[in-house]
Amino acid sequence: MKVNCLVCKICNYEYEVSPKYVCEMCFGPLEVKYNWEYIRKNISIEKISKGPKSIWRYIDLLPLESDYEIDLQSGFTPLVRAKNLGEYLGLDNLWIKNDSLNPTFSFKDRVVSIASNKAKEFEMTTLACASTGNL
């Protein structure tokens, strides 16, 4: 499996992978602890480069154990050189990710794609999404 467990960012308490996002001990946020040995054995630049032109090109690095089924065609948006802004900020090589090319014109499409598929893995039948309105 790609994911070992969930771990609290505050107290380091570990949990089995489940639909939890807050530590029961200290209410700190939980994050994914990856199984890097498994990932190293199952990923290659060649495999990534042959993948679909979407977020799913990086499926081996995402916290999903099953193949994706809910696909919004998000991700794989271009990097755009911001020469003038870079000069203004004193940066020689500034690039900006243009996520306005995602289905709802937002970076949030990536998160929703992964979360929707993870909810399906957990056999959830209802999914709600809080947003500021651009999702």
Region spans (language model):
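PLP-dependent amino-acid enzyme catalytic core
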Residues: 1-135
